[in-house]
A protein has these predicted regions:
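Charged, low-complexity intrinsically disordered segments
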Residues: 1-140
Length: 140
């Protein structure tokens, strides 16, 4: 899907790239942001799992240089905006994804979050934004 002037292979790629969006064009940090885009054809652009690792919040991330920090304000609400924008672009512009979403009818949509080895319980996260987008599509 296309969003913010770039092509993205998944919402995961867009979401994690948004953590590094507010840097000056041409800077090393902005170049890191561009690695997530489909047109970069980089290793990270081809694998949502790598996108998650590159954009990881913990100190064990394997791919991101330590001096490349995520935007200070990302988790002050911008993370929610990025997720909804990415999902909206995906479902509004990709016919197959839209069809699959609509086939879920009125089901509660949840995402399983595994926290194995982190000392925390795994949990189900309700995707309210996705259900909101589905409702909008049904009302078209």
């Amino acid at each position: 899907f296309e969003l913010d002037g770039h092509m993205w292979n998944s919402v995961e790629h867009y979401y994690h790239a948004c953590k590094f969006k507010n840097y000056t064009e041409g800077s090393e940090k902005h170049d890191f942001y561009l690695k997530f885009t489909a047109e970069s054809n980089s290793e990270v652009s081809k694998d949502p799992g790598k996108a998650k690792s590159y954009g990881g919040t913990d100190s064990s991330h394997k791919y991101r240089p330590k001096h490349i920090l995520m935007d200070d304000d990302f988790f002050n609400g911008n993370h929610k905006i990025a997720m909804e924008k990415g999902q909206r672009a995906k479902y509004m512009n990709d016919a197959h994804s839209q069809k699959v979403l609509l086939l879920t009818k009125n089901a509660k949509l949840v995402h399983y979050t595994s926290n194995r080895g982190k000392g925390q319980a795994s949990k189900l996260v309700t995707f309210f934004d996705t259900m909101k987008i589905r409702k909008e599509l049904n009302n078209k």
